[in-house]
Regions:
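Asp-based, Mg2+/Mn2+-dependent phosphohydrolase catalytic module
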Residues: 2-6, 14-20, 24, 28-31, ...
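Conserved phosphate/oxyanion-binding catalytic-loop motifs
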Residues: 42
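Short amphipathic alpha-helical/adjacent loop interface patches that line ligand
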Residues: 71
């Protein structure tokens, strides 16, 4: 039995708006006893907040253990590969919780790492402080590099815009953990005791969700409900295994 790795923003919902067919698809997986994990690049929410958000949107039987975020993967990646624990963070509660769970401490001076996730309240001063740490030698690590974030039918700036700004200013390329980089997948597979042949990646974004699977030789399903549609496939040269307009197409009697 394969495990679905399911994207959230643009696949399950757009901000506070349900994606048509998403609740029905999750209910179908639950009814059939099919396995799934919500694999999201959105590092802003804790697992508890992510669960509550979906329950508020009308999804049923959602558990905290259903979620694996780029924040969790980033914290695990740094903890596994480095012994230092002092970090300067740009991010929200999801990234803060993930770093604390791996025993990182937050500092304003002499940071070992600058960890950058989406922060919708960050300002020029915060970005400049991050730049100072990077120029002083702190390792620059990004949860994800999404250009856009689906939000109630519109698109907001994604974390990739902030990461690119800091890369340009510092001349230092960030270590990127989230989709489409294999790092997040390798950490998840180890954490969940899965293999590549055990999974199906499902998402709306060719540059992240589908690219991760395409480059990793993993089965993918693209749903045309968010950032991209089938007209973008040839332009981006990223080819999903299957394309659907609506997740209801995946529901089988």
């Amino acid at each position: 039995m394969k495990t679905y790795l399911i994207d959230l923003d643009g696949t399950m919902y757009s901000g506070n708006t349900n994606i048509d067919g998403a609740r029905e698809f999750i209910a179908y997986l639950q009814e059939k006893g099919l396995l799934y994990i919500f694999l999201t690049n959105n590092a802003t929410r804790t697992k508890t907040q992510a669960k509550e958000h979906m329950l508020n949107l009308g999804f049923k039987n959602i558990k905290e253990d259903d979620f694996f975020t780029s924040a969790i993967a980033t914290a695990k990646y740094i903890a596994k590969n480095y012994s230092e624990r002092k970090c300067f963070m740009i991010g929200e509660s999801g990234l803060e919780e993930a770093l604390k769970e791996e025993n990182f401490i937050f500092v304003e001076d002499k940071a070992d790492f600058v960890v950058v996730g989406l922060d919708r309240k960050a300002n020029y001063t915060k970005y400049s402080e991050a730049l100072h740490h990077i120029l002083a030698g702190a390792k620059f690590i990004a949860t994800n590099s999404d250009r856009l974030l689906a939000n109630n039918g519109l698109f907001d700036l994604g974390n990739g815009a902030t990461v690119n700004m800091l890369e340009y200013a510092s001349g230092v390329e960030a270590i990127k953990v989230g989709k489409p980089y294999q790092t997040i997948l390798n950490i998840l597979l180890e954490d969940k005791n899965l293999k590549k042949e055990d999974i199906i990646l499902l998402g709306d974004n060719l540059e992240t969700d589908i690219k991760l699977g395409y480059e990793g030789n993993i089965e993918t399903i693209m749903v045309c409900s968010g950032v991209h549609d089938e007209n973008d496939i040839e332009r981006l040269k990223v080819y999903p295994t299957k394309v659907v307009k609506n997740l209801r197409e995946l529901i089988k009697d």
